[in-house]
Amino acid sequence: MKTKAAVLHSAGKPFEIEELELDGPREGEVLIKYTAAGLCHSDLHLIDNDLVPRFPIVGGHEGAGVIEDVGPGVTKVKPGDHVVCSFIPNCGTCRYCATGRSNLCDMGATILDGGMPDGSFRFHRGGTDYGAMCMLGTFSERATISQHSVVKVDDWLPLETAVLVGCGVPTGWASANYAGGVRAGDTCVVYGIGGIGINAVQGAAHAGAANVIAVDPVAFKREKALELGATHAFASADEAAAKVAELTWGQMADQALITVGTVVEQVVTDAFNVIGKGGTVVITGLANPEKLTVHLSGGVMTLFEKTVKGTLFGSANPQYDIVRLLRLYQAGHVKLDELVTKRYSLEEVNEGYQDLRDGKNIRGVIMHSAD
């Protein structure tokens, strides 16, 4: 079958809209028709050469849609089911899934290769195999993906809203609640109010933090943070640190969550300095794995029992927390509709990412055609 998709052929180049051949589902696979796809900063890391995939690759790792067909052996979903995709597949049987850390599932080891778990590909053009970002390729009208990459959701939920819980919302929310361990009465600082950071703010507020301090140079993002749970918002780390010292009588913050688009050494240092004794720094944002971005005092870490940790997907469980967050949304405890700044067509994908770079949107969403 044919499908229209936004494709990257190399780093430093924009997405190109192409018509590709798409294979049908094999054993354990499903055919999905995407309704919506989120514009997440992680795809920009491919363009900026921070993450190096196998090219060419269909972009997009945040998606929601309807199952159109299933291959042999599929038991999780059936045609007609509404699903949200998880950019981390969950096999359920590897060491990490079996010990409750499904966000680290071994199937995720090849998500940048773009192929299926067996190394084969489902997108093709002119004899060339095309990969799919995180084995999903949500910037395509349709895709054939693993059943382990989908989570069934209630069919009365609007998919253009549910799509947000595929990556940014759970990653941010869980960075506060799980990785950060925010508790009622805590002081939590969030650096970077984008698609992940705004949800770290929501997560910290939901956990009952007394002070949720947002740091971002963009004024409208600070305003949105205050709207969705932040108690204070500042343009710089220095301003935030001064306020933390004032609010806590010098005790400093309990958590500092780094949710900037690209992690650099300075923001890690700022976060380390803003936490007090027993405090935790959570690094959620990405950077080029070959670059060193942490340079801290081991002595201070020991004497003050400070913790610096990384987290993938906020240490959440995709199969459980995607559904959980949608229930919280329906109950009014998590805001989703308010996150979307603008919706784009597939052909406007590059415009959407330029808006993201320019700080014009918190969450952009691609709406696929209904055909």
Curated annotation (Swiss-Prot):
Chain sites annotated for binding Zn(2+) 1: C40, H61, C167
Record carries keyword Magnesium: no
A Pfam family the protein falls into: ADH_N
E.C. number(s) listed in UniProt: 1.1.99.36
Temperature impact on function: Optimum temperature is 45 degrees Celsius.
Known cofactor(s): NADH
Catalytic activity field: N,N-dimethyl-4-nitrosoaniline + a primary alcohol = 4-(hydroxylamino)-N,N-dimethylaniline + an aldehyde; ethanol + A = acetaldehyde + AH2
pH-related activity note: Optimum pH is 7.
Family recorded in the similarity comment: Belongs to the zinc-containing alcohol dehydrogenase family.
Quaternary data: Homotrimer.
NCBIfam families in alphabetical order: Rxyl_3153
Protein name: NDMA-dependent alcohol dehydrogenase
Gene source species: Amycolatopsis methanolica
